Amino acid sequence: MNRLAVEIPGLSLKNPIMPASGCFGFGQEYSKYYDLNELGAIMAKAVTPEPRLGNPTPRVAETASGMLNAIGLQNPGLEHVLAHELPFLEQFETPIIANVAGATEDDYVQVCARIGESKAVKAIELNISCPNVKHGGIAFGTDPEVAHRLTKAVKNVATVPVYVKLSPNVADIVSIAQAIEAAGADGLTMINTLLGMRIDLKTRKPIIANGTGGLSGPAIKPVAIRMIHQVRAVSNIPIIGMGGVQTVDDVLEFLIAGADAVAVGTMNFTDPFICPKLISELPKRMDELGISSLQELKKERANQ
């Protein structure tokens, strides 16, 4: 028996470790460093119906224990991804989770209806932190009713399981999670980045051209752990946890808090080998802590 194996809707993971969307592209660059078959899954870069150039530069800034980014969902568009990016990933056994973004509900529906055409795509990750241009630019994921409606619309057309990525920039993440689960989501991924800003002391202006950016990295891990713990208390659907993962102990902390699998984001930029390192270190650390399997952690959680 594979003690690291995880079974969640659409995904048979050989281990619980995967790179997070936006930190791994479509895998081609990282495939030069190691065999992508080592990974539990791959969360691919966000896809929108049409190509997007993204935000003006500068759009990345370092912070203490993290980084800010405002890339603006730069991507080559659905047709290009289906024709050129996903075929490369089809050579690997590793399941692909396609991240889908949009400016309108129709954008999401359009991409989700077709992204499953690739045999590599086993699940969708719905990025609901995008601004809804038809409703004043408020992010889809900040209103329970809007999040419920979008999830339901996507579930009606998707051919693979749908995981919804939760934004931490809300007053009550539990109510958002409950609305999404009620709409039929197969799982949740959490958390997305926290909204932040840095100021250039010489120009007296924000360093990032867009003004604000998403804060990621070790600084946000305690927030992610807290939110996963809160959501797990009211939700039974799978959670893929993320937010500041650096070490194998971080991985186990996320799993104990309530996650079923863990995604690694910002650390891929610091160490491109981080995912395979964590995968290789996990069994030894489990032995040291007396954990026989990941299923054991799940049972412990249920009894808390």
Curated annotation (Swiss-Prot):
GO terms for molecular function: dihydroorotate dehydrogenase (NAD+) activity. PROSITE patterns: DHODEHASE_1 (PS00911), DHODEHASE_2 (PS00912). Its cofactor is FMN. It catalyses: (S)-dihydroorotate + NAD(+) = orotate + NADH + H(+). The active site is at C130. Pathway: Pyrimidine metabolism; UMP biosynthesis via de novo pathway; orotate from (S)-dihydroorotate (NAD(+) route): step 1/1. Its EC number is 1.3.1.14. This is Dihydroorotate dehydrogenase B (NAD(+)), catalytic subunit. It comes from Listeria monocytogenes serotype 4a (strain HCC23). The lineage of its organism: Bacteria, Bacillati, Bacillota, Bacilli, Bacillales.
